[in-house]
Amino acid sequence: HVAHWNNSRKIAFTLAEVLITLGIIGVVAALTIPTLMANHRRQVAETRLEKFYSTINQAVKMAEVDYGDMTQWEPRENKYEKDENGNDDKTKELPNTEYWQKYFLSYMKTLKVEPYGHNTSCLLAYLPDGSVVNFANGSIQFYPSAKDFKFLVDEDTGKIKNNMENSGVKYFTFLFYPSGTQDANKYHYKKGVEPYKYGWDGTKEGLLNSNSIGCKKQVSNERAYCAALIQMNGWKIPKDYPLRF
């Protein structure tokens, strides 16, 4: 008779061990998932910012073929609703749809273009990659994710305004002002659409430290210089970026 030894071992877990294991997995997930999500948001912002910059400036070049040097394009004029006497009501600004359509949107692939609400100068262009551009009469705001687009209503005036807390994270400010010859505009003069650099002194510190529009947590206006800071770093969000995604 030959004996057969069974060397296999039955491994059993107690309920307490299972719960402890699940608890550890839960803690690890709670620590890592927010980081993974933040990293994903950063990557989306980087990719779409660079793509938008390339796409909109290709549009500028194509428009120059049709309309000549961009510094000679007809000026962008503010548009207003008319009052009962047929005069401009300066409290009710409208988007200059014709300007943006003529020089930019005609040369860009969009899913939808529409004014935002009533009594606002905002014209929204939804792009195929899931982003949205707000062509305002003063500047251009780019939202890497269209779902993040949101405006606030000023309680005092009833006017729509930017949600400043989202600037530099959920939206980024650009400017098109190629004909401005003043010294403060030197980084936009004879340039296409650039990250907002009006009044910039040319240094990284200048982008970070401006109390009104610097890329830092506390500012009096919006963090308009953040896109320029990312551009300076090769369209990658710097490791020491002052805002959390």
Across the structure, where does each feature detected by a protein language model lie?
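N-terminal single-pass transmembrane signal-anchor helix
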Residues: S8-R41
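Aliphatic-rich helix starts adjacent to a transmembrane/signal segment
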Residues: T35-I56, V60
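Alpha-helix exit/C-cap motif
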Residues: N57-R76
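Amphipathic alpha-helical interaction segments
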Residues: V60, E81, M108-K112
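Juxtamembrane "stalk/linker" segments
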Residues: Q72-E77, K82, G86
